[in-house]
Design a protein with these regions (language model features):
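Accessory helical-bundle/CTD segments and flexible terminal tails appended to RecA-like ATPase motors
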Residues: 1-155
Length: 155
C-alpha cells in the first residue's frame, strides 16, 4: 500500500523497508511484488498453524487492579466456557481454550489475564462468541473485560 502511494502520476516512487529479517519470505516476495506467491505461502502457513481464516480465534481480556482478581475472572470464565462447550457437545471443534496471563501482564497500572479460544469453523461460532460475550459481561466488581474475535494484535 505504501509503494502504491509513493509515486506521483508518471513518476515512480521508491519505498525503503527497515526489517530485522530481510530474508523473510514476506519481505522477499513484497520486494518482487509477487503477490500470488505470497498468498500461496502465507495461506499454507496459516492453515498449518491453524490461524485465521482457517480457524476463528476469540479471547476475553480481563483487567483489574489486583492480579488475583484478573486471574480469578479468567479462570471463572474458562470454567463457564468449558461447561458450555461440553454441554453443547462441541469439544471436538475447539482446538484450544485456556485461561492464561496476557502477553503484557501489567499495562496502565492494571493486571491482565485472558481466556484464549481457537475453534474450527464447524463449531457454532456465533453461539460460542455470544456465550463468551455473556461470560465477559458477568465479571466481578473492579474487573473489566473486553472480548475480541480474530484480534489483529494479541498483545
Amino acid at each position: 500500500q505504501v509503494a502504491g502511494r509513493a509515486g506521483r502520476a508518471e513518476t515512480p516512487g521508491r519505498v525503503v523497508v527497515q526489517t530485522y529479517e530481510p530474508d523473510h519470505y514476506a519481505i522477499q516476495l513484497a520486494a518482487k511484488q509477487d503477490y500470488r506467491a505470497f498468498y500461496t505461502r502465507e495461506s499454507a502457513f496459516r492453515r498449518a498453524c491453524l490461524y485465521p481464516p482457517f480457524t476463528v480465534i476469540a479471547r476475553i481480556v480481563f483487567t483489574a487492579d489486583a492480579e488475583k482478581d484478573a486471574r480469578a475472572a479468567a479462570e471463572a470464565a474458562e470454567e463457564k466456557l468449558n461447561a458450555y462447550i461440553d454441554g453443547a457437545g462441541i469439544r471436538r471443534d475447539i482446538v484450544q481454550m485456556r485461561a492464561l496471563e496476557a502477553p503484557i501482564r501489567f499495562l496502565r497500572n492494571r493486571w491482565r489475564w485472558q481466556v484464549f479460544l481457537k475453534m474450527y469453523f464447524k463449531a457454532d461460532q456465533e453461539a460460542v462468541t455470544r456465550k463468551m460475550r455473556d461470560v465477559a459481561a458477568e465479571t466481578a466488581e473492579g474487573v473489566q473485560a473486553e472480548m475480541e474475535v480474530n484480534p489483529v494484535n494479541m498483545i
